[in-house]
Regions:
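Active-site and donor-binding regions of nucleotide-sugar-utilizing enzymes
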Residues: 48, 57-220
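Basic, ligand-binding patches in group-transfer machinery
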Residues: 1-57
């Protein structure tokens, strides 16, 4: 419902089953065209689901699908530069091409998907895995109104690359296995951090592999010996 002065408000149910109201600025994705994309993408997905699932699509993204500077970007960059054509053919990075960071990855344009395009909406449904430095929420229009797609995103597997060392933060209520935004896999940086994720966030060791951060791969030792 319009709240005037470029804002809207609408009711929704929280994951705890409580009725809440959201007040936010209007978005270009509130337009009817977004609903049409969702309907068309859902129809295509139903018709071609077996074929799309065989592709084993991975979607990589970062905050608001507007950045390419964290673990998601460096994971994607590694895949593009080190995997064979066959291995990387269905790995895609989702970003708004109007974002400044698009310039950093436009050389991989065949593997870039425009945020909130029809292909993006379709591949959100078809992907077998999301790989990201942020939660599933950042893969779609932020705090959108009633959506055919949003509830399905929450059910898709995600490999959480993190964007900060969890051992230094209290994230259980959000990213814990029983939190409001649980992960399927939770990358950790050390045995110490994995122990914390297992003990306090309730993930198994198999679901919280010690991988380090992909962005650490590009760190350079600039120290000098005196």
């Amino acid at each position: 419902y319009s709240a005037g002065e470029g804002h809207m408000t609408f009711p929704y149910y929280t994951k705890g089953g409580c009725l809440a109201f959201l007040y936010r600025q209007d978005s270009e994705y509130d337009a009817y065209s977004t609903k049409v994309k969702e309907i068309v993408a859902s129809g295509i997905y139903v018709l071609f689901k077996p074929l799309l699932k065989r592709k084993k699509i991975w979607l990589v993204y970062e905050k608001f699908c507007s950045m390419a500077q964290d673990n998601g970007y460096y994971f994607f960059k590694y895949c593009m530069e080190n995997l064979s054509d066959e291995e990387k053919k269905n790995i895609y990075y989702v970003i708004d091409k109007k974002a400044p960071d698009y310039e950093k990855i436009k050389e991989y344009d065949d593997h870039i998907i425009q945020f909130m395009s029809l292909k993006h909406v379709l591949y959100v449904l078809a992907a077998v895995l999301y790989v990201a430095s942020d939660s599933r929420t950042h893969l779609y229009a932020w705090r959108c109104k009633t959506s055919l797609i949003r509830s399905k995103i929450d059910k898709r597997p995600i490999f959480f690359l993190q964007h900060g060392v969890t051992a230094l933060k209290q994230v259980g209520p959000l990213f814990g296995r029983k939190g409001s935004s649980p992960m399927t896999y939770f990358a950790t940086t050390s045995q110490f951090e994995q122990d914390i994720v297992v003990k306090y966030l309730d993930y198994s060791e198999a679901k919280s592999p010690i991988t380090g951060f992909t962005r650490w791969d590009v760190l350079e030792d600039t120290s000098t010996k005196d």
